Amino acid sequence: SYKVSGGLLRVGVSVVNALSKKLHLTIHRAGQIHEQEYAHGDPQYPLKVVGETDTSGTTVRFWPSEWTFSQTIFSVDILARRLRELSFLNAGVRIVLRDERVNLEHIYDYEVGLSEKSALDIAGLPGKLADCQEKDPALSELYLVEGDSAGGSAKQGRNRKMQAILPLKGKILNVERARFDKMISSQEVGTLITALGCGIGREEYNPDKLRYHKII
């Protein structure tokens, strides 16, 4: 997690603190509970001991500043997407996202897969996919074409019964060299993964769900 974030406690918190009207820290360490609060980046009192503990860990609570942001309502979809990426990068770490506004909870654990489907899970096929009529993957073909214009020509000349057409941008992400979180956040890569239907990742990938046995 430290490698991914670039050092959350050295960079992330200081930036969040500067952009928050209020930030509250609770630190469980060495048998003591420490607490400190900030307002618009300024400490309201020195770090103080407020109790004893037999656990360790840090809780950070913050309220975005209306001085900086015109919109201070959190998007659960954006948070869910980022936490899902982090769950793939940090095997064995259990991440819980709770939206108390609607009493909703998502749990991410890469070693055991997603415990609950999130709002990111795509219910249907990509909108640009011109699917074929054939339902048997062994008889189905998927053609990847460059751009919408080429996709239009390919759709006109295809065999609708067995040939599906998926237009993609001319130059998508080089997944061989990209970080996993960047790869799965790519719209074009996500579209391709969804169209193929077999998932991605050690726990979610299932080749038996591949929708096309011939990809061109």
UniProtKB/Swiss-Prot annotation:
Residues 140-216 form the Toprim domain. The keyword ATP-binding applies. It holds the Pfam family Toprim. Coiled coil: none annotated. The record marks 171, 174 as: Interaction with DNA. Its EC number is 5.6.2.2. GO terms for biological process: DNA topological change. The keyword Hydrolase does not apply. Gene3D superfamilies: 3.40.50.670, Histidine kinase-like ATPase, C-terminal domain (3.30.565.10). It is found in: Cytoplasm. It catalyses: ATP-dependent breakage, passage and rejoining of double-stranded DNA. A type II topoisomerase that negatively supercoils closed circular double-stranded (ds) DNA in an ATP-dependent manner to modulate DNA topology and maintain chromosomes in an underwound state. Negative supercoiling favors strand separation, and DNA replication, transcription, recombination and repair, all of which involve strand separation. Also able to catalyze the interconversion of other topological isomers of dsDNA rings, including catenanes and knotted rings. Type II topoisomerases break and join 2 DNA strands simultaneously in an ATP-dependent manner. Heterotetramer, composed of two GyrA and two GyrB chains. In the heterotetramer, GyrA contains the active site tyrosine that forms a transient covalent intermediate with DNA, while GyrB binds cofactors and catalyzes ATP hydrolysis. Belongs to the type II topoisomerase GyrB family. This is DNA gyrase subunit B. It comes from Acinetobacter sp. (strain T4). The lineage of its organism: Bacteria, Pseudomonadati, Pseudomonadota, Gammaproteobacteria, Moraxellales. The gene is gyrB.
